[in-house]
């Protein structure tokens, strides 16, 4: 079984020759991309293991290096998500504020934001005036927006309103 132990940094990835570039991919859910130890199947069906430093969070496009010198590109799996759209930047900022206030991990892009599907949150976003589309999409929340597999964080603090 191949053991992938390193992420190749962006500069080294650019320097890979065409024969060194990854031909295999590894499709992982957001939860799987937060695991430092994981048994996986590569795009060609080979079994492999991830043995990465604790706290590693993989992103789409990351390139991993195995002990044997093999390389593989990380691909984000499509997951059931809600995508909120608005042409009004202030409205989208308000939606992101309210979702963040509920400690919801968010992917934020120009004109839209995305979170794991939750019909209660969808209703809230619609109530604020945004358009919500539910479907299978790739999901990459902002770094540090989650703690473990639950997707939330667990420290205590006072909210002053």
Curated annotation (Swiss-Prot):
UniProt GO MF annotations: nickel cation binding; unfolded protein binding
NCBIfam families, per the entry: PRK13261.1-1 (NF009751)
Protein name: Urease accessory protein UreE
The organism's taxonomic lineage, starting at the top: Bacteria, Pseudomonadati, Pseudomonadota, Gammaproteobacteria, Enterobacterales
Its biological purpose: Involved in urease metallocenter assembly. Binds nickel. Probably functions as a nickel donor during metallocenter assembly. It is not essential for urease activity.
Origin species: Proteus mirabilis (strain HI4320)
Gene3D superfamilies the record matches: Urease metallochaperone UreE, N-terminal domain (2.60.260.20), UreE, C-terminal domain (3.30.70.790)
Protein keywords: Chaperone, Cytoplasm, Nickel, Nickel insertion, Virulence
GO biological process: protein folding; protein-containing complex assembly; urea metabolic process
Keyword Chaperone attributed: yes
């Amino acid at each position: 079984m191949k053991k992938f132990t390193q992420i190749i940094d962006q500069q080294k990835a650019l320097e890979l020759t065409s024969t060194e570039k990854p031909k295999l991919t590894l499709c992982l859910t957001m939860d799987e991309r937060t695991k430092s130890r994981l048994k996986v199947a590569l795009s060609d069906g080979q079994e492999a293991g991830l043995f990465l430093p604790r706290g590693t969070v993989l992103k789409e496009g990351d390139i991993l290096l195995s002990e044997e010198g093999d390389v593989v590109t990380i691909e984000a799996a499509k997951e059931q998500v809600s995508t909120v759209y608005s042409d009004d930047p202030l409205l989208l900022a308000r939606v992101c504020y309210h979702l963040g206030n509920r400690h919801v991990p968010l992917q934020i892009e120009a004109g839209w934001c995305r979170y794991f599907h939750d019909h209660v949150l969808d209703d809230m976003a619609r109530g604020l005036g945004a358009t919500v589309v539910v479907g299978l999409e790739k999901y990459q929340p902002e770094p540090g927006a989650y703690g473990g597999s639950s997707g939330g964080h667990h420290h205590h603090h006072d909210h002053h309103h």
